[in-house]
Amino acid sequence: MSLLIDIVDETNSVSADALQEVEKLLQFAAEKEGVQDQAEVSVTIVTNEEIREINRDYRGKDTPTDVISFALEEEGEDEVEIVGADMPPVLGDIIISADRTKEQAEEYGHSFMRELGFLAVHGFLHLLGYDHMTKEEEEEMFSKQKDLLDEYGLTRS
């Protein structure tokens, strides 16, 4: 089973090793979550300013955030199922702020890689339909995140 992952670091500030680790982590998460073989996801690393613009334009919040996901396979009300649904799905896009990743790693006292992995998994779970709008959803999603990261070996220490 293999996830097709396109990772672009627009900031040129994240090491090739860290980007490769994100790819391995997302492959691991996809396998654990039973994601269809050859499903596609993109990960883009941006600056605080870039993610602030995206957050403002798409969420109405004029402030930087750590990660934003755009699921492409969600069907809303009154939407017709896409023809060719037997094709591997394009799950969507995960956009991560390198600046916020660094800030939060320092704030929480763990490595940049742990924070980057956390944000990648958080965004990936959103693409799979997980959310944290209610207490129950939050508990389910955050527990899933922790389990995936711990099992992969990217713990908070």
From Swiss-Prot:
Signal sequence range: none
One GO CC term, this protein: cytoplasm
Cell compartments where the protein resides: Cytoplasm
Pfam families from the UniProt entry: YbeY
Instruction: List, alphabetically, the InterPro entries matched.
Output: MetalPrtase_cat_dom_sf_prd, YbeY, YbeY_CS
How many cofactors are bound and how?
Binds 1 zinc ion.
- Record keywords: Acetylation included? no
The positions annotated for binding Zn(2+) are 122, 126, 132
Q: Which HAMAP family match?
A: Endoribonucl_YbeY
Could you say which protein family the record assigns here? Answer: Belongs to the endoribonuclease YbeY family.
Write the protein's name: Endoribonuclease YbeY
